[in-house]
């Protein structure tokens, strides 16, 4: 095993509570994300709830992407990379769920922001940065998803500490989140967004190399690049 801790890391990853929508007018998202009442979903209802939130994640994925396959590809690559890095079977299931649900919080971001072709304003960018927190709040009632929550919360943290929402760095970032970060970036670049033309696999690979050790964990990046080379061959 290349690491001595689980893919989700410490529960302290969640940090303090967040005032998500301070000084904004998007109260509907606040109501949906904050007022969800059940502390937990009954065990018998968990699978149905998970199916619903996966459908919600697919809906969010359809905005601003060229083909809506981003989360499916992210989950598949996360499984493959997890296996290569020696993760347990249980952790690979968690990575797959995190890959499918990492952007579910975007379902509560205004469509005008998700589909905006130009750069976001400072306020819009602040709102966009809350999607990992919103996602965790929606998923938290499902006990079965608990191992995936720190990964989903931290998948936009950067290895150098410049990411969001908690400015974690290095091994403070859950190992699973470092995996999702790399594969999420690759599938985003190769699928394209409304604000970014899709890249070739070669172009996206070069971008991963450029950002290795800064945005991404270098060890995880190297392992993923090996997977891409194996696919090419």
What do these predicted ranges mean?
Residues 7-17:
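Short, intrinsically disordered low-complexity segments enriched in Ser/Thr with adjacent Pro
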Residues 20-36, 43-233:
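Histidine- and acidic-residue-rich, metal-dependent catalytic cores
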